[in-house]
């Protein structure tokens, strides 16, 4: 995968480099909050820029929807490669490292979210299912082997549904930390 100017591949290299620099001889905890925008929309809706994942003829979706999803999925593929690389670099570290990844909103789905409606998504936020389809985003709490050993947890399984603003308290709970009361 080739890096572009705003690529997550460049971002994860900087994160790992900065983390190593902060940990050299310090022996203190390090907190890093990094925001990626490599795959932020809007996505091109008049053509597919790279790989074709969805084709109008085989998917039954309109061309514009296929273009939006194809361009989003290409970026998602780069992001997955970059985050996998970051996890591999963090796994090699002797220090305990816990990584939290989350999305803050759904990818752009075309004007008026037409691409989503084409795949049957309901964004009727007055209904619980529509609310979740519109607002829900995935998150991942991952730990390297050193953190698993230090914290005595495997960091496996599924977490609950909650707003990203509650990820810090969830992280504290998963790590067995108490911290300031405003983080609990």
Q: Where do the language-model regions lie?
A:
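Solvent-exposed soluble domains appended to multi-pass membrane proteins
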Residues: 1-184
